[in-house]
Curated annotation (Swiss-Prot):
The gene is rpiA. Gene3D superfamilies: 3.30.70.260, 3.40.50.1360. Pfam families: Rib_5-P_isom_A. Keywords: Isomerase. Pathway: Carbohydrate degradation; pentose phosphate pathway; D-ribose 5-phosphate from D-ribulose 5-phosphate (non-oxidative stage): step 1/1. GO terms for molecular function: ribose-5-phosphate isomerase activity. It catalyses: aldehydo-D-ribose 5-phosphate = D-ribulose 5-phosphate. It comes from Rhodopseudomonas palustris (strain HaA2). Substrate binds at residues 28-31, 83-86, 96-99, 123. Signal peptide: none annotated. Its EC number is 5.3.1.6. This is Ribose-5-phosphate isomerase A.
């Protein structure tokens, strides 16, 4: 069984939590795409739900699958958000944003009663940081912002290369919100909650990919089956 099969299994398990009439946040990334496709099959079979996409890519996927969409300007709360993650630790703290949609993903997740994270077993780690941490930044004053990010990382005992993400054209990758992303290659983040606080306080940082205290449930698919972990 390959990794895509495992992702689809996790997505299918999360779909079991969806009920008629729900308002659902639709995540971004390869695993979340499986959920959108499976949800679309249920919608075509008569399930009545409405979704809020976390990126323009997900919006296009959902529309293609026939899922009715809205925005957080039209509704105030969501019943559920289903999204993937780049890393998950035992406290259900996450690194997200490898696909560049971290800002909208966090806004949508925070507006939800529950967040279910779906992933294959390789995303489960003892300590966050092996996957580069995305930090979404304003282009203005980039050098000053980069220095402040370095200082924040150092304060929690993390260090490594900070790299401006590039798009396929070789220029700076631009998010749906018009911002840039600095990827922090830290290897290990000893205190993710503290780093999240420090990054959020930096002028020039729009958002970061540390999701702390947001995920309610993690569904992990592996070669031995599916494991569900609830936040304590």
């Amino acid at each position: 069984m390959n990794k895509e099969d495992l992702k689809r299994q996790a997505a299918a398990r999360a779909l079991d939590e969806v009920r008629d009439g729900m308002k659902i946040g639709l995540g971004t990334g390869s695993t979340a795409k499986h959920f959108v496709e499976l949800l679309g099959e249920k919608v075509r079979a008569g399930l009545d739900v409405i979704g809020v996409p976390t990126s323009e890519v997900t919006r296009a996927d959902a529309e293609r699958c026939g899922i009715r969409l809205t925005t957080l300007d039209e509704i105030d709360r969501l019943d559920l958000t289903v999204d993937g993650a780049d890393e998950i630790d035992p406290r259900l703290e996450l690194i997200k944003g490898g696909g560049g949609a971290l800002l909208r993903e966090k806004i949508v997740a925070a507006a939800s009663d529950r967040m279910i994270v779906i992933a294959d077993e390789t995303k489960w780690v003892d300590c966050l940081g092996h996957f580069p941490l995305p930090v979404e930044v304003i282009p203005f004053g980039l050098a000053a912002t980069r220095r402040a990010i370095e200082q924040a990382c150092a304060e929690v005992g993390a260090s490594g290369r900070l790299q401006l993400r590039e798009g396929k054209d070789g220029h700076a990758f631009v998010t749906d919100g018009g911002h840039w992303i600095i990827d922090a290659h830290l290897g290990r983040i000893p205190d993710a909650p503290r780093l999240a606080q420090l990054l959020s306080a930096i002028p020039g940082v729009v958002e970061h990919g540390l999701f702390i205290g947001i995920a309610s449930t993690v569904v992990l698919a592996g070669t031995d089956g599916i494991r569900t972990v609830e936040r304590a």
